[in-house]
């Protein structure tokens, strides 16, 4: 069965181009030209991945991403304008898994889609039995087998990337983990010095796990070194 992908871009030519290239790779693809139609479809169908443009005519791509992340874990790839670093950081902090800058080569989109699907499938279908079933600290319980995060008795929705970041920090509890180490462990890619991906995801995690994100008690920053969950 081919993976089902949603492509959302108000520029019909771009949406149709990306759709065609993905279909040529064997994916089942549904294009949309506005966010409202896309979210209605996503709520009815089992989607494996979404490609979202930031600029949409009704609701913007960030709002659409937030709607998706309320109930869905599947990977999301954002399309951003050239040079708009703020868009990239915002998208990643809201739960996007990757981004492509316009103008782009459709083959790059295809490659990134395949990469995200492979990661998601490994995440969902891993059969390895962890030596530790859960981690607990200061009212938070991270359940490894069920991929759940419980904070003071209430479940906190984490994206697959957020869960893996938190798990890696717990696995190395008491040690400072650099952004480079964390990125290469979670994303399985080479880290670049100007990469803000880890920082954006840590900020998002803190918003979900701390009453005062600017004064984090769980995930602490060791300036110039990295991040730590203390023992």
From Swiss-Prot:
CDD domains recorded: trans_reg_C
InterPro entries (UniProt xref): CheY-like_superfamily (IPR011006), OmpR/PhoB-type_DNA-bd (IPR001867), Sig_transdc_resp-reg_C-effctor (IPR016032), Sig_transdc_resp-reg_receiver (IPR001789), WalR-like (IPR039420), WH-like_DNA-bd_sf (IPR036388)
Top-rank lineage group of the source organism: Bacteria
Entry keyword set: Activator, Antibiotic resistance, Cell wall biogenesis/degradation, Cytoplasm, DNA-binding, Phosphoprotein, Repressor, Transcription, Transcription regulation, Two-component regulatory system
GO cellular component: cytosol; protein-DNA complex
Induction or repression: Expression regulated by upstream promoter elements. Part of the probable VanC-type operon associated with vancomycin resistance.
Modified residues (4-aspartylphosphate): 53
A GO BP annotation: regulation of DNA-templated transcription
Chief place of localization: cytoplasm
Subcellular location(s) of the protein: Cytoplasm
Post-translational modification: Phosphorylated by VanSc.
Alphabetized PROSITE patterns for the sequence: OMPR_PHOB, RESPONSE_REGULATORY
Function: Member of the two-component regulatory system VanSc/VanRc. Binds to the promoter regions of target genes. Activates the transcription of vanC1 and vanXYC in response to vancomycin which results in vancomycin resistance.
NCBIfam families: vanR-C, vanR_ACDEGLN
Record-given protein name: Regulatory protein VanRc
């Amino acid at each position: 069965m081919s993976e089902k992908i949603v492509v959302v871009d108000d520029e019909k030519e771009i949406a149709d181009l990306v759709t065609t290239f993905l279909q040529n790779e064997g994916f089942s693809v549904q294009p949309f030209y506005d966010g409202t139609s896309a979210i209605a479809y996503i709520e009815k169908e089992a989607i494996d991945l979404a490609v979202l443009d930031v600029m949409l005519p009704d609701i913007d791509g960030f709002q659409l991403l937030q709607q998706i992340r309320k109930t869905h874990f599947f990977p999301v790839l954002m399309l951003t304008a050239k040079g708009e670093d703020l868009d990239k950081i915002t998208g990643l902090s809201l739960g996007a898994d990757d981004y492509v800058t316009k103008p782009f080569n459709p083959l790059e989109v295809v490659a990134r889609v395949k990469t995200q699907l492979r990661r998601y499938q490994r995440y969902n279908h891993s059969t390895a039995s962890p030596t530790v079933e859960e981690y607990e600290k200061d009212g938070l319980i991270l359940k490894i087998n069920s991929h759940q995060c419980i904070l003071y008795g209430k479940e906190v929705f984490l994206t697959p990337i957020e869960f893996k970041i938190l798990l890696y920090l717990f696995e190395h509890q008491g040690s400072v983990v650099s952004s480079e180490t964390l990125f290469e462990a979670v994303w399985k890619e080479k880290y670049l010095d100007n990469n803000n991906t880890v920082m954006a995801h840590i900020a998002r995690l803190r918003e979900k796990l701390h009453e005062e994100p600017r004064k984090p008690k769980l995930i602490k920053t060791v300036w110039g070194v990295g991040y730590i969950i203390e023992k």
